[in-house]
């Protein structure tokens, strides 16, 4: 496995087909997001000075706006500001399932043979078993998960603070990015400042129970400072890099920083 994943669609054939079948749905979500942002044809023409029928010119402008938005969010991100926490009584036990495929296509992962692979700017790259992860000190948080589709839910998440894990494996904490690869072919990445935020967890449990497959068993990233698509499930690999790694939906037009 290289230091960074490909920015092409997921590479595992079965999982690739599952995600590629969702491309039409993804384009529809992107269209809705664009409309929600309130950029009418007239407003876009006025803003860009472009003929909006020139799709390449418009896309170039939108890409530039997205990059500017990412930079602006990174500049105002406060790594010491905590997201609100809630009483356990407000945590939803039957948390909503959300993915771009049905529950019959959820990856089937054998916990006994599971390995978390590490690569990139990391001193100790030996793979971790699930039992290795369970033996690490764990903490819990009750925070709100915010989806880009417009819904949110409060959940109780238990796992290992990601900062603790990165320190344990000897990751270069001055590097720019941390990336994730998942059993369903999904891939994601976050900035190092967000990775080190005290509420960013490698999650092993939800509502005090081992993650069910639909919630990302055996390992999910919980990062309440970002939108839901930045919380990858079914994680099988983590890497640290200074090269921008991209991410699945962001490579298709979503904002990369995606702060809440």
Question: Which positions does each model-derived feature cover?
Answer:
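N-terminal secretory signal peptides
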Residues: 1-29, 33, 43-44
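N-terminal twin-arginine translocation
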Residues: 27-36, 44-63
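Intrinsically disordered, low-complexity segments enriched in small/polar residues
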Residues: 6, 10-12, 47, 100, ...
């Amino acid at each position: 496995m290289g230091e960074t994943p490909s920015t092409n669609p997921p590479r595992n054939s079965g999982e690739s087909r599952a995600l590629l079948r969702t491309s039409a749905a993804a384009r529809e979500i992107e269209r809705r997001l664009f409309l929600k942002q309130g950029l009418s044809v007239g407003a876009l023409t006025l803003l860009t000075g472009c003929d909006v029928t020139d799709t390449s010119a418009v896309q170039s402008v939108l890409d530039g706006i997205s990059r500017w938005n990412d930079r602006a969010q990174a500049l105002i991100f406060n790594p010491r500001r905590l997201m609100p926490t809630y009483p356990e009584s407000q945590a939803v036990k039957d948390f909503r399932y959300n993915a771009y495929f049905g529950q019959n296509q959820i990856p089937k992962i054998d916990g006994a043979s599971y390995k978390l692979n590490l690569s990139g700017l990391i001193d100790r790259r030996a793979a971790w078993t699930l039992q290795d992860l369970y033996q690490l000190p764990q903490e819990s948080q009750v925070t709100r998960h915010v989806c880009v589709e417009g819904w949110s839910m409060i959940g109780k998440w238990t796992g290992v603070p990601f900062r603790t894990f990165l320190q344990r494996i000897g990751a270069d904490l001055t590097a720019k990015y941390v990336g994730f690869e998942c059993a369903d072919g999904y891939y994601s990445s976050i900035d190092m400042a967000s990775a080190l935020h005290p509420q960013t967890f490698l999650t092993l449990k939800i509502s005090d129970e081992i993650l069910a497959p639909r919630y990302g068993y055996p390992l999910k990233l919980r990062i309440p400072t970002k939108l839901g698509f930045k919380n990858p499930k079914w994680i099988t690999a983590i890497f640290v890099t200074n090269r921008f790694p991209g991410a699945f939906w962001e490579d298709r037009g979503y904002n990369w920083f995606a702060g809440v």
